[in-house]
Amino acid sequence: MPQLPLLTPLGMLTLSEEDGAIVALDWGRGRDRTETPLLRRAADQLQDYFDGLRTGFDLPLNPTGSPFRRRVWDALRAIPAGETRSYGDLARSLGTASRAIGGANGANPIPIIIPCHRVVASGGAIGGYSGGDGVATKRWLLALERRARPAAPDDLLDAPTAGHDRPAPTP
């Protein structure tokens, strides 16, 4: 299986490809180093993500998992960067239990690209994270995405900038 190790701000990560799709993103260095066009594209997109230039990924993915887990992972990909959802919110939307959502999150073979870090406990508690340095990594990823998130028009309505709250001069 072609693999490509990457040095990132979170340490060494390894991308794996099988049959023309990304199948894993693992913490640490893989056993193989075979650069394919898809692995290079994925590595470039991850670099852009870490540089704050990208908030999502456009890659063929084929994570190994049950049909239920695949449904959860698809739901994770629909959570916008810079936002979070609770395990309970996802459970209600998928008609299942929060614990099942947590199990699917923990089994996610392509973290970051399938953004399981965007799921938090009820009440806003950060919850767990199985990758990297655990919760510290999850906090880092969420902070990165909040900084990279494009401003929404409503973000500007309540915060006038000094000097910009007066009318424009007339010609």
How does the language model describe each region?
Residues A104-N105, P109-I114:
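Major-groove DNA-recognition helix of helix-turn-helix-type DNA-binding domains
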